[in-house]
A protein has these predicted regions:
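Short active-site neighborhood of thiol/selenol oxidoreductases, capturing the structured segment around
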Residues: 24-55, 67-68
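Generic recognition of short, well-ordered alpha-helical segments
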Residues: 48-49, 82, 173-176
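N-terminal "domain-start" segment that seeds a small globular fold
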Residues: 1-29, 49
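A short, polar/charged loop-to-alpha-helix boundary motif
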Residues: 170-184
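Short, thiol/selenol-centered motifs that function as redox-active sites or metal-ligating centers
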Residues: 41-54, 73, 77, 152, ...
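Thiol/selenol-based redox catalytic cores and closely related redox-interacting motifs
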Residues: 90, 97-170
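A generic local structural motif
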Residues: 20-24, 54-57, 81-82, 139-140
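Structural microenvironment flanking redox-active thiols in thiol-disulfide oxidoreductases
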Residues: 50-104
């Protein structure tokens, strides 16, 4: 993916502060590459699968010099921490965005019926929920918007270096491939 400036986003980046450390994304990404992961709602098995996948490869990503920041829609840190701990991804930098302002700033919208409820979503949902054991629960205000689509962005020195925009709710990105764009 070609590098492109994100002047319109830099203001938003400064406003995106982590719940746990109070740092903002603009400063973080100036110092080291950041893998910014926008999650679906915590009740979604695909969201839980993403947290699990990232937890498994976190040491490799961080050893390569990247910082991982999760963006979620839960209004309180306790809800997010519960899920991050469950998947051994705590402590982790995370940003609460219950109004989905940052999701919109990065071009992540709400999914259409076909993106969320197509046959492959049901098949992958069974795989993730039952076979992999991630479970699920109904969307609620405390865990996020059930129609929100996720995405992954690699940010560094004021630019988006790479991105993975989910076309379907069940897409399972290769996070290691996504960060390879910026190997230090």
């Amino acid at each position: 993916m070609p590098e492109y400036p994100v002047n319109s986003l830099t203001t938003v980046w400064r406003e995106m502060t982590t719940v746990n450390s109070g740092e903002n994304i603009a400063e973080m990404a100036q110092n080291q590459p950041v893998m910014l992961v926008f999650l679906r709602h915590f009740g979604c098995s695909f969201c839980r699968e993403a947290i699990f996948d990232i937890g498994n490869i976190r040491p490799t990503i961080e050893q390569d010099g990247f910082r991982i920041v999760m963006v979620h829609m839960a209004p309180d840190a306790a809800t997010a921490v519960k899920f991050f701990k469950r998947y051994k991804l705590y402590p982790i930098d995370h940003i609460a965005d219950p109004e989905k302002r940052f999701y919109r700033a990065f071009g992540l919208g709400r999914g259409a019926t076909a993106q969320l409820f197509g046959l492959m979503s049901w098949i992958r949902g069974f795989e993730s929920t039952i076979l992999e054991g991630h479970g699920m629960s109904a969307p609620s205000e405390e865990i996020g918007d059930g129609f929100q689509m996720p995405g992954v962005f690699v940010l560094h020195k004021g630019q988006i270096k790479n991105a993975f925009i989910h076309q379907m709710s069940h897409d399972r990105p290769d996070y290691l491939e996504i960060v390879r764009c910026c190997e230090l």
